[in-house]
Amino acid sequence: MDSDIQRQWGELAEEVRGHQFRYYVKDAPVISDGQFDELLRRLTALEEQYPELRTPDSPTQLVGGAGFVTEFRSVDHLERMLSLDNAFSSDELTAWDARVRGDIGQEPEYLCELKIDGVALSLVYENGVLVRGATRGDGRSGEDVTLNARTIEDVPERLAKSEKYPIPALLEVRGEVFFRLEDFEALNASLVEESKPPFANPRNSAAGSLRQKNPAITARRRLRMICHGLGRAEGFSPESLHDAYLALGEWGLPVSTHTTKVRGIAKVQERVNYWAEHRHDVEHEIDGVVVKVDTVALQRRLGSTSRAPRWAIAYKYPPEEATTELLDIRVSVGRTGRVTPFAYMTPVKVAGSTVSLATLHNASEVKRKGVLIGDTVVIRKAGDVIPEVLGPVADLRNGNEREFVMPTACPECGTTLAHEKEGDADIRCPNSRSCPAQLRERVFHVAGRGAFDIEALGYEAAIALLAAGVIEDEGDLFGLTADDLLRTDLFKTKSGALSANGARLLDNLDKAKQQPLWRVLVALSIRHVGPTAARALATEFGDLEAIEGASVEQLAAVEGVGATIAAAVVDWFSVDWHRAIVDKWRAAGVRTADERDDSIPRNLEGLSIVVTGSLPGFSRDEAKEAIIARGGKSASSVSKKTAFVVVGDSPGSKYDKAVELGVTILDEDGFRALLADGPPA
């Protein structure tokens, strides 16, 4: 077939799809029905003449808005989306400024921006055309929400041309998605009219609206966006962030009108104080002010830590507080048996959310805070997110209050509670094998995003499977069959057949069997073993059998593990029924070993290597795993014992330390040579 015909079809199909999206999803057509019909007729005629062009996803084969469904597949960011360090006082802000000035040897200009309380979004434009929108995720990869991002009023599908700022070949721009308060209130009013529960606060509703599978719903939610940073760019090298914002505005991207450029920490503090007084005058919620070094060259010199740039900080305002009645103190039992008291309160609105529950951590914390059941208590949302009981308003006591007494028996199974060892603040239910609460929480944990990531296995499903006796514990999950699920009402239809959710659960379980070893380790609910320690163990040992057979000393020697985690791993595998869980999973086909490349040489044995800055060819985890796989130690700080420092973009102070100590410095090419050939003889 002529390539010109294929190109003609591709351009026409893309144009029709664009108009379908504007009509069916955004409800904002830009051409008449007649003009659209003419485009569709031309496309249909072309496919009739060349039938091989007609594909199942062609606009001619889809009805209405069919096909516009957001799947939330994982996509990698071109540059990492870092977080921000926080300052909660003037002293902390001043100390940060002193570190910045000390590192660069001058007083920089700062940009002061409002810290919008929303959800982060990254947009990628290629030659001015929006090709992707993604959530922050873990900073390295996020969820693809491109269709939903296109429905946001502020997000242009094409960048506007500018004589002063040519459109770059590639532009990755970061921003915050949020609700204006009036739009949030209107949304909640409409939900109430439809007898649906309203959202608790604008941030949660923004996050939920951005993650709708049906982008038409997102379009109706009237989300807004403000851009506040750049990722990777090709053909665009601004000297300052201020200049970058001017360019973004010229291209039609939304930038804040409240950003101010100042010099000196005193001027920064003035802006912080001003917005503390006027935070409720803004059309959206804010929870602080972000302060950034404006000059890009100075940003590069300052570099970043593993989680946040050194050239920026978020000044967080004190969280809002409220008083309410403490109706009761109850306890919950977690998956590792920890018994946690929590406050049950008269619902009260704090920082935009309705709060009725708050953790009290342990009995010692209850005593330290001095709260009594029946007290009027002061609560706040730490970071405007987590509800916390600060303490009682003792002057309002009427004599009817009573002390909380920690139960001596598990509220779920009746087993006597105990401290695991002397001096522990927490008490636990030792009936870990059959306590109903621990069983529920462990089964639910197996399905979590940090473990096997089984979407169809929710809390309700975990309860149903255990209640029906379909599973005895989490070890039975991967052996489930359709007949097993039919023993529960949750997974069968009225006619007695397996429901769609049941079929989806079986499919999810089958796919989860191929998850990497570190996820298996997290799913086992070993005390203290989260994703970081699990990755380290999986990288070092490669299979579960080797981890099970390792000594405390061998485990503790793994970087990122240490003695406490090592002892917890050995203790866990010493229990017969724990090992039985692993045996059941292995028998059901769960992969308990990662594929290892024996051809990788152990040519870095005993060498301590530090990686600083970003390497275009390696993620941070990839570089770390490459070092560990060759017997080296991926260290986090530079010392006299460091053999090599690998320097990428924005290296920060580790580079300076390496120069000071005379440590060998490698660029990415040198790092690749080191991995391939080992250190020079």
UniProtKB/Swiss-Prot annotation:
GO terms for biological process: DNA repair; DNA replication. It catalyses: NAD(+) + (deoxyribonucleotide)n-3'-hydroxyl + 5'-phospho-(deoxyribonucleotide)m = (deoxyribonucleotide)n+m + AMP + beta-nicotinamide D-nucleotide. Its EC number is 6.5.1.2. NAD(+) binds at residues 33-37, 83-84, 113, 136, 176, 292, 316. InterPro entries: BRCT_dom (IPR001357), BRCT_dom_sf (IPR036420), DisA/LigA_HHH (IPR041663), DNA_ligase (IPR001679), DNA_ligase_AS (IPR018239), DNA_ligase_CS (IPR033136), DNAligase_adenylation (IPR013839), DNAligase_N (IPR013840). PANTHER family: CHROMOSOME TRANSMISSION FIDELITY FACTOR 18, DNA LIGASE. This is DNA ligase. The gene is ligA.
